Amino acid sequence: MQCALYDAGRCRSCQWIVQPIRDQLSAKTADLKGLLADFSVEQWCAPVSGPEQAFRNKAKMVVSGSVEKPLLGMLHRDGTPEDLSDCPLYPDTFAPVFATLKPFIARAGLTPYNVARKRGELKYILLTESQFDGGMMLRFVLRSETKLAQLRAALPWLQAQLPQLKVITANIQPVHMAIMEGETEIFLTEQQALAERFNDVPLWIRPQSFFQTNPVVASHLYATARDWVRQLPVHHMWDLFCGVGGFGLHCATPEMTLTGIEIAPEAIACAKQSAAELGLTNLHFQALDSTQFATGQGEVPELVLVNPPRRGIGKALCDYLSQMAPEYIIYSSCNAQTMAKDIANLPGYRIERVQLFDMFPHTAHYEVLTLLTKTR
């Protein structure tokens, strides 16, 4: 991938960009095999990759500069702003949105937040696009509600220019820290969720729900999990750390009972909406802590699927799963290091299958799907 920002030394986020994708995949595979070297792996599946550029469905832009000439991008370590509107990781559909947002910020009088001075209102612009219908969700992350009336008043102009903006919100983040969003979300449109669809499975994206940023590879990841589950004699499963329900909704069948657990209520609202659309009445999604839910149960299903954050599932959940011993565990991880540590705490299981998914090209990061089977 060619990137003028990288070539000019203005951005180094894609640290592996000079390596061909083939070499990147080889390095990631070697890293994963090194982390799992202490375990016997029955089957290594071929890694899955997607497009090298224009693959992201989400942009997280720091707003800097002045209200008349805002910059959308990032701040370097020394506080110097960098405009990343032309980043080649974003699809072509993002450029006209960024170009329109800059004069809109001036129209609405949304002064960019100045980190050094602790002054200003607009901290971030968060933009998400649906691959299903091209609809977009735009979130203005503000320091306070001071400029909310001005934002509302100027909004009709923006919506006329960019009718693809289906969901628009103001998120209030009052803390002087590099935190992307606050707890308060104020909807500025009637529509509150973005429709998405992977592999003919309806999914929904709400403002404070996690959603994978690489739709092509994520679609392969969910489809692979579905295929693995269909090969197992499973009638009841848990989907822990389930997010908007991507794994569970793909794996579920009308005959299967599935419980999905996720701590974020916004994500659970999305999962419930999808389950209702699919007409699957044996799917139950609850907004709870996954570890607390699991360890509070007196019995487990045949299959437990986990998709934890980077920290992994942790020793308490590993100990519980070891004790209760479900027949199968499917572990989806964005941090193979913590996954390997967790697997070491599951001594009663063998690794039947592993597959790497290159969700984050040009970086050292990747996603991995692992099937663990109870040793007889």
Curated annotation (Swiss-Prot):
An MF annotation (GO) of this entry: 4 iron, 4 sulfur cluster binding
Keyword hit for Zinc: no
Keyword RNA-binding among record annotations: no
UniProt-listed InterPro entries: 23SrRNA_MeTrfase_RlmC, MeTrfase_TrmA_AS, MeTrfase_TrmA_CS, SAM-dependent_MTases_sf, U5_MeTrfase_fam
Catalytic reaction(s) noted: uridine(747) in 23S rRNA + S-adenosyl-L-methionine = 5-methyluridine(747) in 23S rRNA + S-adenosyl-L-homocysteine + H(+)
Family that this chain belongs to: Belongs to the class I-like SAM-binding methyltransferase superfamily. RNA M5U methyltransferase family. RlmC subfamily.
Protein name: 23S rRNA (uracil(747)-C(5))-methyltransferase RlmC
Originating organism: Citrobacter koseri (strain ATCC BAA-895 / CDC 4225-83 / SGSC4696)
Originating gene: rlmC
